[in-house]
């Protein structure tokens, strides 16, 4: 008989149509029920992923956590995938995917002594091709996903080799008819797969109540057992993702190659909730900048490394990358929660970034009188051509309205092009200065630039007030602005009045 691997899971969205507190409670409830089923039913295997959820259990119910450790050792509970959570698989940068994998892998290896080699992202809305080489180099040889579905993306087969940009390959399976089954309907889902795949040597079906947790039910296990006893072509076995792919490889089935991305699905999610996407990218950039500067300062023996702050900020980043938070497909309170989580990460990083930055500046020469030193750090392992914006305070206010301060920027004693722009402040005194200059920043280096100020004659604007009005007239267009109200009193073009007094 041909084997059909039944993989029982309980997809738990930490947040979605509910908030994080409910996600924690549902995780505990689902894991308790699943542990009972593992003890009560011989041959049954429960599969679950996401180390963040296991951390919740470890913190809030140590006894249950101990049961799960025992069940994993007994082969009744399978640690699946081994990521921190199921993130959005399009928006994060490559390094963020690496962190999702490493955080989960380290946790499961430490707590359970396991290293899964099949990755899963059941509920993500698409998958970047760049994931292939990341997963391959992280120790994965296979991948299970559900979206995009067959009506959204035509693949050469539902089991295939996904080829990455660097030529890496991993075996993939697009799961049949989603990752879950409704209560009492798992057998119907299994029958549906068998009807479509008569003659197939090896197959896989995901089942279990999901989204808001749930997992197995007694009625489903009863019906599956009845189906198992009556089915003549397929041997139904409770199994794991790794067991399925191992048998698939041994079956001799030649898998076709696919070298594309796996998109699109729910494309509107990638054009909405911009606040979440913006603060995610800000946290992402601040985390990796702070981490690199801190590591540099440690190696230079000028500062220690802020491991605790980096770990906290990394977990905040990974949570914001959850596949219903970052795309913006959750309820409004979840969007507000994302701002809180990302804000916490930024708050953790800020003092550490300041500390590392100042430490890396500590060996720089003292500035000469009248010179304002500016330091710019390039965290990248390559030279960067960058437009640098900087604000600084003059030692004293320029109170002469006939003069204004002009910055001159020098790099290694050579003057480089720059320009003064309006500072963020609207404080109407020549005291706070913003300048912009173009710079070449060497890789992994703290670069120094020196600014010297020159007082220049303040040019007079060509148009002067006429009483209580500003009047611009070039012969074709005439505009009159009321100095008392700031409004346009008159607008005329080619002799035609567009706006008259009191129009606004």
Question: For each of these PLM feature ranges, what is it?
Answer:
Residues 380-407:
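Surface-exposed beta-strand/loop patches in extracellular or lumenal glycoproteins
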């Amino acid at each position: 008989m041909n084997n059909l691997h039944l993989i029982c899971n309980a997809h738990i969205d930490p947040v979605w149509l509910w908030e994080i507190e409910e996600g924690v409670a549902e995780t505990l409830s689902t894991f308790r029920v699943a542990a009972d089923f593992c003890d009560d039913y011989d041959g049954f295997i429960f599969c679950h992923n996401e180390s963040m959820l296991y951390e919740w259990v470890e913190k809030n119910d140590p006894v249950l956590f101990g049961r799960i450790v025992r069940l994993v050792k007994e082969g009744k509970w399978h640690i699946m995938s081994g990521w921190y959570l199921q993130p959005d698989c399009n928006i994060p940068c490559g390094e963020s995917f690496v962190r999702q994998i490493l955080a989960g892998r380290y946790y499961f290896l430490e707590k359970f002594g396991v290293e899964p080699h099949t990755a899963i992202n059941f509920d993500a809305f698409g998958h970047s091709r760049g994931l292939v080489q990341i997963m391959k180099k992280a120790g994965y040889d296979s991948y299970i996903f559900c979206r995009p579905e067959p009506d959204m993306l035509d693949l050469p087969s539902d089991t295939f080799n996904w080829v990455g940009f660097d030529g890496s390959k991993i075996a993939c399976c697009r799961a049949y008819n989603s990752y879950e089954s409704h209560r009492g309907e798992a057998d119907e889902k299994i029958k549906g797969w068998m009807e479509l795949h008569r003659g197939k040597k090896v197959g896989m079906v995901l089942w279990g109540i999901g989204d808001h947790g749930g997992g197995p039910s007694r009625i489903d296990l009863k019906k599956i057992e009845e189906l198992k006893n009556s089915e003549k072509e397929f041997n139904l076995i409770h199994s794991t993702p790794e067991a399925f792919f191992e048998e698939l490889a041994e079956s001799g089935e030649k898998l076709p190659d696919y070298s594309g991305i796996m998109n699109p699905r729910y494309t509107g999610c990638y054009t909405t909730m911009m606040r979440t996407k913006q603060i995610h990218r800000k946290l992402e950039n601040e985390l990796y900048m702070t981490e690199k500067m801190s590591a540099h300062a440690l190696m230079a023996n000028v500062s220690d490394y802020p491991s605790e702050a980096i770990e906290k900020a990394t977990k905040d980043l990974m949570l914001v990358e959850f596949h219903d938070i970052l795309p913006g497909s959750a309820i409004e309170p979840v969007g507000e929660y994302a701002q809180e989580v990302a804000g916490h990460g930024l708050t953790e990083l800020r003092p550490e970034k300041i500390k590392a930055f100042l430490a890396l500046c500590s060996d720089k020469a003292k500035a000469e009188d009248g010179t304002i030193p500016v330091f710019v750090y390039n965290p990248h392992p390559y030279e960067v051509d960058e437009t640098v914006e900087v604000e600084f305070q003059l030692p004293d206010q320029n109170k002469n309205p006939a003069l204004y301060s002009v910055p001159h920027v020098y790099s290694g004693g050579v003057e480089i092009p720059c320009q003064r722009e309006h500072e963020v402040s609207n404080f109407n005194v020549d005291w706070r200065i913003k300048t912009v200059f173009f710079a070449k920043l060497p890789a992994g280096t703290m670069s120094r630039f020196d600014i010297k100020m020159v007082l220049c004659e303040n040019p007079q604007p060509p148009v002067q007030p006429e009483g209580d009005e500003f009047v611009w007239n070039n012969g074709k267009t005439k505009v009159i602005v009321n100095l008392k109200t700031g409004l346009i009193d008159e607008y005329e073009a080619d002799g035609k009045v567009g706006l008259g007094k009191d129009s606004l």
